[in-house]
Amino acid sequence: MVSATAATVASVSPTVTALLAAIPSPAQGVWMLGPIPIRAYALCIITGIIVAVVWGERRFIARGGEEGVVTDVAVWAVPFGLVGGRAYHVATDWRTYFGPGREPIEALYIWQGGLGIWGAVALGAVGAWIACRRRGVPLPFFADAVAPGIVVAQGIGRLGNWFNQELYGAPTTLPWGLEIYERVDPSTGLPDPLTGVALDDTPIAVVQPTFLYELLWNFAVAGLVVWADRRFRLGHGRAFALYVAGYCAGRFWIELLRTDPATRVFGDIRINAVVSVVVFVLAALYVAFGKRGREVLEPSDEVSSEPGEKGAGETSRDESGGDEHGDRTVASSDPRPPAADSDRDSPLR
């Protein structure tokens, strides 16, 4: 995929160098530590995961959860998410790996890039559900706590596309266009878009920096979720649904700007644009019609790590005092958060 897009932009006129301003790409995305490759793509993903876990832990505790639960759930959710993300990418871009002249084994080469967020969230949620059951925590309560951190992690992960010089848009004359350089193997001088080094800082193209658009959009969505969560006391999975809806709205228009090869449906529409619309509608409906109020966890007298045991984990109720599953549940009518909690879930403190 990377080599194909590099070949496409190589044909662009060199007059792009006359632009007054542009965003430079890194000269390389891989560094060798002896025989071990250090990949910027992986470092960005790891950094995003750390941010999501740390911020999610703080929000989870601020909402009444037990310390350490988010880290425990991440041990399950992250591997499931990586597998799901890769599986979705391969399933929707199977022509890259299967067919005449292709190498099916490369479907496992996750370090070359290629993770589909839809598969990552879906299978990651399965891993989170398993871990939440083991800890006795309702999955919607957990999801609401970690939602802003997840979308920030996605934004940080987009920096990996910047280092890899991939998934960008069409050539542009905008002053914030992204410069694309030809990368080569220093030892042979042959083109090597993925692991090579740019020996010349003359761009072969200046393109739409879709990685940057999505990064900024994701950060804005995180801010929206935090604000709405404080203002409306979102619970029962509605904060997570708001994140999903917000992300899909941005992914739709950004997807239309991208020029990398993609599976197309309904004529000439990129499949991820279609998925964005479908998921947006479902998430928006849940935000609009989902259960109001915010549940509160109450630790039981005995806490067990095994699911199904008496006293295991924590029980939840609405802030109004009713049991979550009882007939007396009444959602809180006051949308304003208590003053003491107003800043407890902020990542900057």
Model-derived features: positions:
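A feature for loop-to-transmembrane-helix boundaries and adjacent hydrophobic helices
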Residues: 1-349
